UniProtKB/Swiss-Prot annotation:
Pfam families noted in UniProt: F-box-like, Hemerythrin, LRR_6
Name used for this protein in its record: F-box/LRR-repeat protein 5
UniProt keyword terms in alphabetical order: Cytoplasm, Iron, Iron-sulfur, Leucine-rich repeat, Metal-binding, Nucleus, Repeat, Ubl conjugation, Ubl conjugation pathway
Region feature (Hemerythrin-like): 1-159
Stored InterPro entries: F-box-like_dom_sf (IPR036047), F-box_dom (IPR001810), Hemerythrin-like (IPR012312), Hr_FBXL5 (IPR045808), Leu-rich_rpt (IPR001611), Leu-rich_rpt_Cys-con_subtyp (IPR006553), LRR_dom_sf (IPR032675)
Biological classification of the source: Eukaryota, Metazoa, Chordata, Craniata, Vertebrata
Task performed by this protein: Component of some SCF (SKP1-cullin-F-box) protein ligase complex that plays a central role in iron homeostasis by promoting the ubiquitination and subsequent degradation of ireb2/irp2. Upon high iron and oxygen level, it specifically recognizes and binds ireb2/irp2, promoting its ubiquitination and degradation by the proteasome.
Pathway assignment: Protein modification; protein ubiquitination
Gene that this polypeptide is encoded by: fbxl5
Subunit structure: Part of a SCF (SKP1-cullin-F-box) protein ligase complex.
Cited Gene3D superfamilies: 1.20.1280.50, nmb1532 protein domain like, Ribonuclease Inhibitor
Domain notes: The hemerythrin-like region acts as an oxygen and iron sensor by binding oxygen through a diiron metal-center. In absence of oxygen and iron, the protein is ubiquitinated and degraded.
Repeat keyword on record: yes
Length: 696
């Protein structure tokens, strides 16, 4: 029995195997007829395999035991050599290679016996020394758990040798042996002694199927998508391996269908394609759409160019269908980027299936495709595209504000949870401190507010169906400098014994008596002041207030729900702290001044291009500015968006504090934000994108 607990005894198990091998070659040494050439060569082959195992055993001990011990104790140095294993292997190989005649065999046998006896007398005491000297030192310098881990690693390395022996020759032929040594640094030994016939057969032939999974996967990384698909058809094991997620991080179906098998990260995002190349792809799509695959008429006389275009489009469609049906269900969660730019066959249904199968996308390019709003139905739930950083929808002319609303929802919500936490903190503080003064006034006695005061007016609901007639409407007038949440105000009234009116809507009043539009969950009454821009333009009584759409340029509010950045229009002014409405919950909250930059990946969009999406309006831009805005957005291209206005641009830009003016593009006819530093319209004289000046 070992003198140490078996769980932490790192030497006894492997040494038992080594001692067993010593006994086997000593027994064969006494039984081998060295006059017989077959027996002689069989014994030498057996010795080669045995001493390779000895050498690998020593290498494992050096790396996983002695090396670690030397790091803990400076008393251990230069104590573990290979015990002349390399010299013995050279002796065996020389015998197999050079000894031919019977006399040479007999002379060699005498030398071999002497060398083996000398090695045995040295090797057995060496193992005993490790068990009696090094094991106690390990117990002294390592914890019990550390020793358990060391033993597991040692056993695992010994157990992995057999398949490595078979794979060695294949790897050397592929010039990958050095890389394999770095990955494993150990061969696997046989659990049972191999027969001479097995050893001779093993030295003569190897097969790639014997490679470890890790090495096969390393080889597969050098293959293109077409070759990977071919490998997946070899056998079921390779089929599973070819569908490893790390092999399919970046997908380029359009390029692959045309023979370009690039599979690295996406190219330069600012590089526009050549117009001739775009035209050729458009011609392909046109030819494919005009071609009827079910036509009864012989179309064999079609031009060669049309035939090539149709063939390319057919390959693309077949490739897309194959990916959706066979590949993405297995690897979709690992896919990070999909580029479908200028695809002539992709449909909204295909895109919808792709997005539902690839929830962790960071890069999506649908430039100049024929998709509609329904393609993004899978983003209609909160946090559906949480990781998305790059979205290129340039030239997708059928997209409307509905897509942007889905995108805003899928990117997540920065405001909701934070606002809830802030309200809890405020309630605790309010219960400990005296409330701010609140005056209850009759509506008829309310005077217009002056330039020096900003107020919020909370109106009582005039009455419900079937209820008794109400007294004249009363309102709360709160000083903006001490303004708090509506829930806090209700709490104060409860503590003071004042009945709380049933609040259903609120009005924000700006300096000079200008008002904001009425915001409410259900239909209510508009205020007696001027109505909002959007209610005037589109009659949207239920539209949530975007503040800047109905406020003057000097006091436009921001809807940024995450970071402390000054609005473009309020930069340099010392206005009062405004309270805005959380876009998701419909409750009131303070505009948080000390909220930190989101680090959990929510609303992480950095690149957004809507170039040529002429159906997008300010409503879509406002949807993006809600739920915390786009705090990380750096690139925004709205070239060719003909229906957006200065108001909508300001709404979105105020929610994008990281926006780089050099990468901010919009129509030159709009007097929008950052007019002096933004880059203007990119679609001027562009032959394949919408532009208001395309007729010039």
């Amino acid at each position: 029995m070992a003198p140490f607990p078996d769980e932490v005894d790192v030497f006894t198990g492997p040494h038992w195997r080594m001692k067993q091998l010593v006994g086997l070659y000593c027994e064969k040494l006494s039984q081998t007829n060295f006059s017989n050439n077959n027996d002689f060569r069989s014994f030498l082959q057996s010795l080669c395999a045995t001493f390779k195992e000895f050498k690998m055993h020593e290498q494992i001990e050096n790396e996983y035991i002695i090396g670690l011990l030397q790091q803990r104790s400076c008393n251990v140095y230069n104590v573990h050599s290979d015990n002349k294993l390399s010299e013995m292997l050279s002796l065996f190989e020389k015998g197999l290679r050079s000894v031919k005649s019977e006399n040479e065999q007999l002379n060699y046998a005498q030398q071999l016996k002497e060398r083996l006896e000398a090695f045995t007398q040295d090797f057995l005491p060496h193992m005993k020394e490790e068990e009696e000297v090094f094991q106690p030192m390990l117990m002294q310098y390592f914890t019990y758990e550390e020793l358990k881990d060391i033993k597991k690693q040692v056993i695992a390395q010994h157990s992995s040798q057999q398949r490595w022996d078979c794979a060695a020759e294949v790897l050397k032929g592929l010039s990958l042996w050095s890389q394999a040594e770095e990955l494993h640094k150990a061969f696997k030994y046989a659990d049972h002694e191999k027969t001479d016939d097995e050893l001779e057969k093993e030295l003569c032939s190897t097969h790639i199927s014997q490679l470890p999974t890790e090495i096969l996967l390393c080889l597969f990384r050098y293959l293109g998508p077409e070759d990977l698909c071919h490998c997946g058809q070899v056998c079921s094991a390779w089929s599973d391996l070819a569908k490893t997620g790390s092999l399919w991080r970046h997908l380029y179906p359009v390029r692959w269908a045309r023979g370009d098998y690039y599979r690295g990260p996406p190219d330069d995002v600012n590089q526009e394609p050549d117009e001739e190349w775009v035209k050729s792809l458009q011609d392909e799509g046109k030819a494919y759409q005009e071609w009827d695959e079910d036509a009864d008429v012989d179309e064999s006389d079609a031009s060669c160019e049309d035939s090539l275009a149709i063939s390319a489009a057919q390959r693309e469609k077949k490739l897309l269908n194959g990916m959706i049906q066979n590949l993405l269900p297995a690897v979709g969660s690992s896919v990070r980027s999909i580029v479908l730019a200028y695809s002539s066959t992709v449909s909204s249904k295909m895109v919808r299936q792709i997005l539902s199968l690839c929830p962790n996308l960071t890069h999506l390019d649908l430039t100049q495709t024929d998709v509609t709003d329904s393609a993004f139905d899978s983003w209609s739930s909160l946090w559906a595209c949480l990781s998305l950083e790059h979205l290129d929808l340039s030239g997708c002319e059928k997209l409307t504000d509905r897509t942007l609303k889905k995108l805003s929802l899928g990117l997540g919500d920065l405001a909701s949870p934070t606002c809830s936490e802030k309200r809890s903190d405020r309630r605790a503080k309010l219960l400990k401190s005296p409330p701010s003064p609140i005056s209850l006034l009759d509506k008829r006695s309310l005077r217009p507010t002056g330039h020096s005061r900003q107020v919020l007016i909370f109106k009582q609901w005039p009455g419900k169906l079937g209820s008794a007639p109400c007294s004249p409407t009363r309102v709360w007038v709160l000083d903006a400098s001490e303004l708090a949440d509506i829930e806090d105000a209700a709490e104060w009234n409860r503590r003071r014994g004042v009945s709380t009116p049933e609040v259903r809507g609120f009005v924000e009043t700006q300096p000079g008596g200008l008002s904001c539009c009425c915001r409410r969950r259900r239909g209510g009454f508009r205020t007696g002041f001027s109505t909002s821009y959007w209610q005037q333009q589109y009659g949207l009584g239920e539209a949530g207030c975007g503040h800047s759409t109905c406020c003057t340029g000097e006091t436009a509010l921001r809807t940024l729900g995450g970071l402390q950045y000054e609005s473009y229009t309020t930069r340099g002014s010392a206005g009062a702290e405004f309270r805005t409405k959380c876009s998701s919950g419909g409750q009131l909250c303070l505009e948080c001044d000390n909220r930190t930059d989101p680090s959990d990946g929510r609303r992480s969009l950095r690149f957004l291009s809507l170039s040529g999406c002429y159906q997008v309006t300010d409503l879509g831009l406002r949807a993006l500015s809600q739920r915390g805005g786009l705090p990380l957005l750096e690139h925004l291209n709205l070239s060719g968006c003909l229906l957006i206005t200065e108001v909508g641009l300001q709404e979105l830009v105020s929610a994008c504090p990281a926006l780089n003016d050099e990468h901010f593009y919009y129509c030159d006819n709009i007097n929008g934000p950052h007019a002096d530093t933004a880059s203007g319209c990119q679609n001027l004289q562009c032959g394949f994108r919408v532009c208001c000046r395309s007729g010039e």
